[in-house]
Amino acid sequence: MTTVISARVSGLRSTPSKLNLVADLIRGQDVSTAVMYLKFCRKKAAFLVGKVLKSAVANARANYDVDLDSLYVKEVLVGKSFTLRRVRPRARGRACRIRKRYGSVVIRLLKR
């Protein structure tokens, strides 16, 4: 039986489309390779996804006592979380709505 190690974070202050760009980099990679990709990627979303990946690795180390060299990223699920709505005043008494979108990330690791 294979154990799937996962970590989930909701409410990340980045849009799901930006998180998905970074998630595409690490899908199917070894954990050490994925950490290197995220370390040298110059995006804010890479920092956020990297924290979730480190949490999944910490879960593997603490709960399952797994060798970290044998882990790889099985799947990275990116979804949308809540949306904050703000109002921006415009000309002639009108107003526009500003949508500040938040994302959620689930990372699942598997042993090779």
Curated annotation (Swiss-Prot):
The name this protein goes by in its record: Large ribosomal subunit protein uL22
Keyword GTP-binding: no
Presence of keyword Ribonucleoprotein: yes
Gene3D superfamilies for this protein: Ribosomal protein L22/L17
Oligomer status and interactors: Part of the 50S ribosomal subunit.
Keyword entries, A-Z: Ribonucleoprotein, Ribosomal protein, RNA-binding, rRNA-binding
Lineage: Bacteria, Pseudomonadati, Pseudomonadota, Alphaproteobacteria, Rickettsiales
Primary role: This protein binds specifically to 23S rRNA; its binding is stimulated by other ribosomal proteins, e.g. L4, L17, and L20. It is important during the early stages of 50S assembly. It makes multiple contacts with different domains of the 23S rRNA in the assembled 50S subunit and ribosome. The globular domain of the protein is located near the polypeptide exit tunnel on the outside of the subunit, while an extended beta-hairpin is found that lines the wall of the exit tunnel in the center of the 70S ribosome.
Protein's organism: Anaplasma marginale (strain Florida)
GO biological process: translation
Example of a GO MF term: rRNA binding
Family to which this protein belongs: Belongs to the universal ribosomal protein uL22 family.
